[in-house]
A protein has these predicted regions:
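N-terminal active-site segment of His-dependent metallophosphoesterases
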Residues: 1-55, 63-70, 128-131
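Active-site neighborhood of phospho(di)ester-bond hydrolases with catalytic His/Asp-centered motifs
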Residues: 11-13, 32-38, 56-61, 82-85, ...
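Residue-level signature for short turns and capping positions that connect secondary-structure elements
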Residues: 16-17, 88, 121, 150
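Short, conserved loop/helix-junction motifs that constitute active-site signature segments
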Residues: 48-52, 76, 110
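Helix-adjacent hinge/juxtasegments
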Residues: 54-92
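Conserved beta-sheet core of the metallophosphoesterase superfamily
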Residues: 77-145
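Short, solvent-exposed aromatic-acidic interface loops
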Residues: 144-152
Length: 152
């Protein structure tokens, strides 16, 4: 993929067959969307494809009827991304490890790898608010992560 000076990726996880209409509004100007699993049924992905045809999906532990890979390694603008639903025991060689499953947002560094979880967009868990994430590259700089709460 050619390097772009500005690039924006919408990151979503754990929709569990539902998500807030606000997600479509937040994601309307993204270059692509990454879903980190627990979609549960294909119609959710059809709604995301209506926002952008550039949709990447990995399987979650509740995606029994779907046929997507359990993990993916991608490169965008010179940075490496590993997408998976459940955080692996061993860190793969990557710059970013994106995961879901916990339904709780996370944004931290571990051993030189940026760990990012956008939280859950569809099913709240133990008081964590519904949320989505963004990876944004501006003016050719490295990607930065941000979590957006869908409700307060």
């Amino acid at each position: 993929m050619a390097e772009k000076q500005n690039y924006r990726i919408g990151v979503i996880s754990d929709t569990h067959d539902r998500w807030k209409p606000r997600v479509a509004e937040l994601f309307r100007d993204v270059d692509e969307i990454w879903h980190l699993g627990d979609v549960c049924h294909e119609p959710v992905l059809d709604e995301l494809r209506a926002i952008t045809s550039k949709l990447t999906v990995v399987l979650g532990n509740n995606d029994f009827e779907l046929t997507y890979p359990p993990s993916l390694d991608l490169e965008r603008c010179g940075e490496r991304f590993h997408l998976v639903h459940i955080l692996p025991r061993r860190m793969p060689p990557t710059d970013w490890l994106l995961f879901g499953h916990t339904h709780r947002p996370a944004d931290e560094m571990h051993g030189g790898v940026h760990l990012f979880n956008p939280g859950s967009a569809g099913l709240a868990n133990k008081g964590a608010p519904l949320s989505v994430g963004f990876l944004t590259r501006e003016n050719g700089k490295k990607f930065r992560a941000k979590v957006i709460l869908l409700e307060r």
